[in-house]
Structure formats: C-alpha cells, structure tokens
C-alpha cells in the first residue's frame, strides 16, 4: 500500500487506477494560490509573481484628494481665520493699521494738510466692533481723509503714554494745527464723529508743515522704555528762562543774571513811575 501511495496510484475496487494523492495535493495548492490572488489581506492586495506558488504582497496607496476639494478646504480655513478679525473687514484705501509708535508719529507728519483720524480700538471691545462698519462707510464717503487704526491690545504701552484709557476713542489731526479734536463715541453718539468730520474736513490752505503729535506726547513716547521710539526736542521751543537756569547752574560756567519775578517787576515799575512823577 505504501509503495502504491509513493507511486502516485492506487487500484480501485472496480479495477480502475484512481487519481494519486500527490496530484491532488498539487491541484489543491494551485487552487489556493488562485484564491489568494483574488482576496485582499488586511489592506494589502495579493499578487503572485513568483514560481512555485509564492505570493508577493503589495501595499495599496491611498488616492489623493481632488484639487478642488483641497482648495475648498484651504478657503474654509482662511475664511474662519478672517471672520475673527472684524477690524479688517470693509477696509477702504484710506484706512490702515498702525504698526508702532514711530509709524504713528511719521504718518501724522507725512500727512501734510490732510485731516487724519486716529481710531483707537480693541478686538474685544463690543462698542468698537459695532461702530467699525459705520467708520468704514464714512471713510468711503471721505476719501481725502486718512484713517489710522491703533490696536489697543498690541500697543497698550503706547496708548498709556498717549493717555488713552477709554474705547472706542478718536483723535483728529490737521496740518499745522496738530490735534484739533479728541473724544470717545459709540453708535448712539455717532453724530459727534460726523460733526467733527464736517468741521475739520473741508479743503483749506495749510499755513505750515504738519505738526503731528504734541510735544508732551512725543516726550512721553520717548521716555517709555517699552517702545523703540527716539525723539530730540526742538531747541527753539525751550523756554529762555530754563536755558538761563541751566547755564547758570553749570559748574564753571559764566554767571548770568536770573530773570526777575513778577513781584520784582511790579515793584520796579512802581518806583519808576514815582520817580518820573517827581515824588
């Protein structure tokens, strides 16, 4: 029997030679290989490329998203980010945000005789957010006026130096006059803003270069260590009495007479009048 099995044939009861077990095993292996080619295994597709029934597994690659879906996803993220920055909506060509104290000072000086409105706001200020669309409309109707936005959260130290403690807050500057108006208003008091715009906005001939920030404001910004702002006071604006006191107090400097007080001048004037009258 063992020899018959090894020879691959066995006699049937009817005298016919049956199919050998070895042949059956070969057919079974071939069927298993064919089945393996058509059945995926754990995210892999099986493909037989080797002889003797060996199976090679190739990894399935994920299909890339269509370009239109990727673009839509990016636009959605961009829209969400922009929706949170309400102060950037409805901006007009004559509206821009201030980046630093130096930027504010230079912008006012370079505006010439143009009316400049400085808008102090905060992203978390509900009144500022409600008023912003109306300010943008007024900017659109008055293209000759320059609107400068100052973000209070980004420039707290600068706002402290400029004595801005309430929001929304506005300051109007015009040419050689410098600051011509300063106030706070909301939607309920928007008429105050419109009146100031009508009063200081009409075209007129300037009598000198733009003044910009006040001298005291420039000094306050210069001594603020949190700001990268430098300013040299104009020597022409230093009072004569202060200059005399500094020179007289300087060690080794020439002695200069101090200016007379108001009382001394009054007494001297009285004596002169008495002498002239002959008393």
From Swiss-Prot:
Catalytic machinery residues: 125 (nucleophile), 128 (nucleophile)
InterPro entries attached to this UniProt entry: Thioredoxin-like_sf (IPR036249), Thioredoxin_domain (IPR013766)
Domain Thioredoxin: 56-202
GO cellular component, one term: chloroplast
GO biological process: cell redox homeostasis
Pfam families from the UniProt entry: Thioredoxin (PF00085)
Cystine connections: 125-128
Keywords for the protein's UniProt record, in alphabetical order: Disulfide bond, Electron transport, Redox-active center, Transport
Similarity field: Belongs to the thioredoxin family.
Biological role stated in the UniProt entry: Probable thiol-disulfide oxidoreductase that may participate in various redox reactions.
Name of the protein this chain belongs to: Thioredoxin-like 1-1, chloroplastic
